[in-house]
Amino acid sequence: MVKNVFKKLGKKQKNNKGFSLVELIVVIAIMAVLVGVLAPQLIKYVEKSREATDIQNCDSIATTLKTYYSDKEGAPDTIKVTVSKDVDPVIDPTTQTPLKDTGLETTRLKGTKWDGNIDITYTSATGKITYSASSDYYTATGTDDQIKPKN
């Protein structure tokens, strides 16, 4: 009886099927090469995505300012919002309401390629928005221009 059990165990061990250590090392090496080649490209696209999100947030802030102050009596003549990487948007505390209403009061720049801040200035007399921003990917200066990708 005991001999039969050992014979069965011995047969099972001889019929083991699986990957050898060499095969596993080859697969890991191939995966490491693929990651090394593809990672820089992926990082570049992630950075562009962050900057595009920053631009969309700034456009939302500009639209919010236009909408809020188009109907507001006694609004200041000029409202300037500065969006940066390190601090929440800097504006006059009396004009903070439109950003709080839309949840944009804590918007910060997430892209790493911005040269500085994005300044958004709304002039109520003309109803125009002026952007001032610069990065490796995007630039804008002018009235009612969107922040556009560099060519």
Protein language model annotation of sequence segments:
Residues 84, 88-90, 105-151:
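Short, surface-exposed interaction loops/tails
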Residues 63-83:
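Alpha-helix exit/C-cap motif
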Residues 1-19:
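N-terminal leader/signal peptides at the extreme start of proteins
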Residues 38, 45, 65:
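Conserved alpha-helical elements of the SDR catalytic core
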Residues 25-28, 70, 85, 96, ...:
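Contiguous, function-dense segments enriched for cysteine-driven chemistry
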Residues 44-60:
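Aliphatic-rich helix starts adjacent to a transmembrane/signal segment
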Residues 16-42:
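N-terminal single-pass transmembrane signal-anchor helix
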